Amino acid sequence: LAERMSARLKVPVECRDAARLAARWHRIVAGVQALRPAALLDLVNAADALRRPGRLGILLHACECVAMSPPDAPDDFAPARHLRAALVVVKGVDAGAVARAATGKAKLPAAERADTIAKAIRAARLAALRAWKRTARP
């Protein structure tokens, strides 16, 4: 629906992407506190929140509007706080250091090197999220 409406209304690409993101993830964002670290990281990656943090803000605002629409809704949208805190944890991982440690001085083919680095960075981010979830308050 978001895709068809965006095409019909000729909305800017950024708006179309935000609508697509909200349509795909709004139910998951509402229950973000219950997500496992892998799903949480997938959400951060899907929102492209590391490169474009504004997209996460747009997603959270859309989700908050949906959640706060009933008259008896709470004044605070806790999933937004939780997801923003998770993003801080993910950003706290030094991807450059992880990449250097993952490859060392090994001479790997470019594709294998990129795959090794991507897997190591994901593992480090997951470890950071696991540690955070053990200590984070709901």
Give the residues covered by each predicted segment.
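C-terminal subdomains that position terminal phosphate/3'-OH groups for nucleotidyl transfer/ligation
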Residues: 1-138
